[in-house]
Regions:
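Hydrophobic helix-and-loop "lid/oligomerization" segment in the mid-to-C-terminal part
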Residues: 4, 9-138, 143-179
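Acidic/histidine metal-binding catalytic segments
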Residues: 1
Length: 179
């Protein structure tokens, strides 16, 4: 069950380009052991507390789009997170909703964590825009080409302003309509 769940989540439910024939072969072998793929999927994706769904709705209402750069971002302050009884994991996957918007190739979520006095940043892309390099160059973070993370010790507003200012250095690769 755990292996299936890990492969399913890491491949975006098998939609990411990194999903290969071998991925499906491994999954086929796991299914032969009698695990229920629908039970695992339901446990992970259809098992949200009501506050998490409310947080998702709120976060999506705050999405900002930078149309000329095919970029969007969401910011959530600690106060906003607390309003929805935030628990670790509640924001998992929210950043991916930005990539479902037509022509968006770069999506970011900024989350204030006042306990650690940092801003947690999750970056996602589709196509040829390398968020690993962006994350590394701008915030000292890392990950891989289409998914990365970072931490900022600046305030939420200063982190977002730094991000927005940094986008100008990536204008050409972001403006490209090639996704």
């Amino acid at each position: 069950r755990s292996l299936y769940a890990g492969i399913m989540t890491d491949t975006g439910s098998f939609k990411f380009p990194s999903t290969t024939e071998l991925t499906h072969l491994v999954i086929s072998n796991l299914l032969k052991t009698g695990i229920s793929h629908s039970d695992i999927h339901n446990h992970i994706y259809d098992n949200n507390k009501f506050e998490r769904v409310q947080l998702l709705s709120f976060a999506l209402s705050k999405i900002k789009i930078i149309e000329n750069l095919n970029t969007c971002y969401i910011s959530l302050s600690q106060k906003e997170l607390n309003k929805f009884n935030y628990e670790k994991g509640d924001t998992e996957g929210i950043v991916n909703y930005g990539l479902s918007i037509k022509n968006i190739k770069f999506a970011v979520i900024f989350m204030e964590n006042s306990n650690d006095n940092v801003i947690r940043i999750s970056l996602r892309s589709r196509g040829d825009f390398d968020v690993n390099q962006f994350s590394k160059n701008i915030f000292g973070g890392g990950g891989h080409k289409n998914a990365a993370g970072a931490i900022s010790k600046k305030s939420l507003d200063n982190t977002i302003n730094y991000f927005l200012d940094s986008l100008k250095n990536y204008k050409e690769s972001l403006k490209s309509k090639h996704i």
